[in-house]
Amino acid sequence: MTARRSSFEDEAVDYAAVGATQRSDLMQYPPEGYVPSEDEFRLGSGEERFALATSALLTWGLHRSSGVEITDVHPGTGVQYGGIAFAEDGTPLEPIETHEEQRFAEDGTPFITPGTTVVFAGSVGGEPLVGPHRVISVTEEPGHVSLAIGTMDGDPESGEQSFTIEQREDDSVWIVVRSFFRPTKGAAKLVGSKRRRKTMNDAYLRALLPSRGL
């Protein structure tokens, strides 16, 4: 695997603290001006449940089951941010790229790759979710798979959200949703609010339940 530096000027996100949803202290020290959130929900247990949940996450199944239409998809190159250090104000320092090869689900659906850009249209839990987004990172480790997505210019809110599927020591499988958002200029104050995020997170958390067919 080769790492190289880049400015990431093409298809850039509209916020500075790229990757901050992966920080353990996000809830205590969110990027300045942003509202953080974190919720988790148990999906079941076992290897099969973990595999089904992670496959759904990495093929947009989570979003589609939550009521979001995925449009204008431009696959990424597999390049993602890695090894990010943060300043005290949450600004990332010296981002490094890593390259990941394209992978596919059992049914042949391509997995989401870092750098992919999409436009969301629809609603989650009755809350509108629209606008352009970029996949910041995809992490696959034993018992831990995560997807981080950031907003781009033209979105009514600015920030990042990560979705993590975990298989814990007791074999239980969980989804963890973390984010930080604020409304963009001219957007309604409700956008980026704690109530809106809680409503949306609850819908995301339940979208992967076995009863939903995933």
Descriptions of predicted regions:
Residues 151-155, 178-186:
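Short, solvent-exposed aromatic-acidic interface loops
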Residues 57, 162, 191-195:
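Extended Gly/Ser/Thr-rich low-complexity repeat segments
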Residues 34-36, 111-115, 128, 158, ...:
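A general secondary-structure signal for short beta-strands and their flanking turns/coil
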Residues 1-114:
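Hydrophobic ligand-binding cavity/cleft-lining segments
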Residues 51-62, 154, 170, 206, ...:
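Short, intrinsically disordered, mixed-charge
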